[in-house]
């Protein structure tokens, strides 16, 4: 059973949200990435980088500054947040009707090295990490298979190959990874017989035909500032957690990027626009969509100011017993999100590699027609932790 979230961790959660929105903005600033659909788990990346921070020495301050409040901060806050996230936010309550969640951290270290006992204890106890010795030097392909199989198992087959071909060789010394699986049923499922084909307007001004889910039931919708926000709660288990998907729909058909900019520059934006009550709906349409998205995150993290871990100046000496320097060469992240009448299925994995409610008020009918590009996120509302975030520019594109 998930426990109550510690109050002193809530500020760290605000920092995690800030990191999530900055990273989302960095992804969208790349024209090639921005043109398609995007889905990723900032929580997965945050936990992976926090684990690196736990093993860093002189490099630690820069990591904490990016992951925390933008100042020097304290690595202990990141460890405390990770522990609360693993034990509270990502606890599995599917047996009592809540979302099915699986989350795992893994540390794969070359047989020529050994983890420092203090780091291994912290990783196992606070991050619930699995540690495993592998032979990158002599059995590279076998080691890659072990990492990929581990991710595939945790994500129940949604993510089969987190490590791209050629990404690991005999100079690889360490892989830190995590994998996340989320499957939630809507609190109010959509009637499949109401799903109809209609037009979705693309950013270039053209239109496509796609499947839209529809409903006449009351919905959580807020309207303000040329923006509508839809909250779709997932069915709950017996604990206090409440997961929800949020659809942020700009008023203008081409308003996605201006909305994205506001989201990244105003950390309180999400909280200020969360619908607080249900309303009667008029025309209500939400497209079904499926997104598979993968990217290498080191260049994005550098753009955010995280330079040292990826350079020869990296100091990860609190992680392994070795006289040889260790730096992070790659951070691979892959996500999958599917939204349909039943609910949402989502998965994410990150690997970092080292190389040497109130009563509803009576209101007018509110339309919510998501027939043009929009942002979405999946959040645990009690803690305020953003688990997945992304945007849909074309619901017909799945990869």
UniProtKB/Swiss-Prot annotation:
Record key words, sorted: Plant defense, Protease inhibitor, Seed storage protein, Serine protease inhibitor, Storage protein
Induction: Its expression is regulated by the 'high lysine' alleles Lys1 and Lys3a.
Keyword flag Amino-acid biosynthesis: no
Functional description taken from the UniProt entry: A major component of the endosperm albumin, this protein acts as a storage protein during grain filling, contributing a substantial part of the grain's lysine. May have an inhibitory function during filling or germination. Inhibits cathepsin G in vitro.
Site features described as Reactive bond, chain residue numbers: 357-358
Lineage, opening ranks: Eukaryota, Viridiplantae, Streptophyta, Embryophyta, Tracheophyta
Region annotation Signal for targeting protein Z4 into the ER lumen: where it falls in the sequence: 36-56
Organism of this sequence: Hordeum vulgare
Tree of life domain: Eukaryota
GO biological process annotation, one example: defense response
Chain residue ranges for the region called RCL: 343-367
Gene3D superfamilies reported for this sequence: Alpha-1-antitrypsin, domain 1, Antithrombin, subunit I, domain 2
GO cellular component, one term: extracellular space
Molecular function GO terms recorded: nutrient reservoir activity; serine-type endopeptidase inhibitor activity
Tissue: Highly expressed in embryo and endosperm. Is accumulated and stored in the endosperm, where it exists in a free and a bound form. Expressed in roots, coleoptiles, shoots and leaves.
Domain notes: The reactive center loop (RCL) extends out from the body of the protein and directs binding to the target protease. The protease cleaves the serpin at the reactive site within the RCL, establishing a covalent linkage between the carboxyl group of the serpin reactive site and the serine hydroxyl of the protease. The resulting inactive serpin-protease complex is highly stable.
Family: Belongs to the serpin family.
Protein name: Serpin-Z4
